[in-house]
């Protein structure tokens, strides 16, 4: 069963997604990042090129011929055929249709109240379906 991890109070979703992608790549996991829009997907694509001066995180947009062998795939379309099913990083305000295909889902919730309200709805929906949930609040130890 898919494990769902909620990460809340995140000041910058793109930077946080880059950190998760970097950590996943370091542990040899394969990641799909679901962006809210094409613009956000393109911004994440650009941000991953600049994570650090010493790290390179191989990534492509979904649909790229290299997607099956690339550890990080970015998309704004949850209905596209995806090559990986280890981890899904959800940057959207909705429950992805395909979340159960993944071993693990990271729900990234910003400081924005509307984003937090939608995140709470998703948390309740996952809980009603008996998915294992964890909750990490940024800034708390």
Regions found by a protein language model. Give the residues of each.
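Short, glycine/charged-enriched secondary-structure capping and boundary segments
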Residues: 47-49, 102-105, 121-122
């Amino acid at each position: 069963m898919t494990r769902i991890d909620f990460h809340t109070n995140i000041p910058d979703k793109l930077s946080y997604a880059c950190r998760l992608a970097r950590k996943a790549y370091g542990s040899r996991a394969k990641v799909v990042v679901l962006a809210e829009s094409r613009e956000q997907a393109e911004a994440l694509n650009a941000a991953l090129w600049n994570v650090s001066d010493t790290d390179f995180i191989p990534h492509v947009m979904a649909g790229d011929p290299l997607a099956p062998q690339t550890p990080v795939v970015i998309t704004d379309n949850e209905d596209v055929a995806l090559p990986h099913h280890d981890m899904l990083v959800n940057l959207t305000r909705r429950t992805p249709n395909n979340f159960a295909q993944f071993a693990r889902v990271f729900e990234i919730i910003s400081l924005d109240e509307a984003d937090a309200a939608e995140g709470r709805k998703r948390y309740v929906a996952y809980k009603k379906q008996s998915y294992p949930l964890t909750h990490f609040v940024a800034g708390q130890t």
